Amino acid sequence: MKTVILFSFLLVLLGCLEAGHAQRDPEFSSKARQMLAVFGNSEVDRYTKSRNLPALIEFYEKYSSRLPLTVQDRTYANNVVRRYRAQNNQQVDGVPAQGGIGLAFALLLPFAMSIVEGIAKAIRE
């Protein structure tokens, strides 16, 4: 009897894990395609890309484990995210600093390209 209960519990657990995995895939694919549409398209202007940088950072932080990046690219991306967060958290006279998007864009452009390549590989898999 114990083995039947244990086996049933195992089947329920596997079913829950599979259902959770299936629910995340459409969200990942949808967001990945959005990031590719903005950052993987050479016709998208710089302003649009810079406006979508926070979304790319959020995407990377949420799905970095699912992106097939080299160790070097992953280390670089983590450093860039940390520097980006530090820059955004700077305060001048008690309020967030204004401007500086050009610097942030220049800092994040190589990061964006490596992430876009990782996203494209992840979608193909």
Swiss-Prot record:
Cellular localisation: Secreted
Disulfide bonds: none
Keywords carried by this UniProt record: Immunity, Innate immunity, Secreted, Signal
Signal sequence, renumbered to the chain: 1-22
Chief place where the protein resides: secreted
UniProt KW Ion transport keyword: no
Pfam families per UniProt: Turandot
One cellular component term from this protein's GO annotations in UniProt: extracellular space
GO biological process terms on file: cellular response to heat; cellular response to UV; innate immune response; response to bacterium; response to heat; response to UV; response to virus
InterPro entries noted in UniProt: Turandot (IPR010825)
Family designation: Belongs to the Turandot family.
Role according to the record: A humoral factor that may play a role in stress tolerance.
Protein name: Protein Turandot F
Organism this protein belongs to: Drosophila simulans
Gene from which the chain derives: TotF
